[in-house]
Amino acid sequence: MRNDPVISARTLIGVPFRLHGRAPDLGLDCVGLVVVAYGLSENVPTGYSLRSRDLAHWERVIRAQGFVRRHAGWRRGDLLLVRPGPAQIHLGVWTGDSLIHADAGLGRIVETPGI
């Protein structure tokens, strides 16, 4: 059984943002946050940019990790795939009332109330 992803993600709050980062001591991006929080190790994407329009690609990547798509009724510990801008796709860990994610603008992992 995997560790609680919310507890794991909260330990990462404040870790510096680093594109393609996979190690908390060096920095994480949103994919790295998900890799660490959910304890993933196989088929982890690389070579992507901060901008992407290919939502279908990211949905396939997420399904390949065993996650199930849900449009509403999110639960604590769910992985959220969101589109914060027209050319941006983002991942985060839903706590039940906030989203833990890698914020490139703020330069670190943060917890944002609501969504």
Language model features with spans:
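Short secondary-structure junctions and interdomain/linker hinges
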Residues: 16-19, 69
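Surface-exposed patches in mature extracellular/periplasmic domains of secreted proteins
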Residues: 18-21, 44-46
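...with weaker cross-activation on analogous glycine-rich loops/strands in unrelated enzymes
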Residues: 3-6, 43-109, 113-114
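A glycine-biased structural micro-motif
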Residues: 10-14, 21-22
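Active-site nucleophilic cysteine motif
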Residues: 22-41
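Short glycine- and Lys/Arg-enriched binding-loop motifs that mark or flank ligand-binding interfaces
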Residues: 17, 23, 28, 88, ...
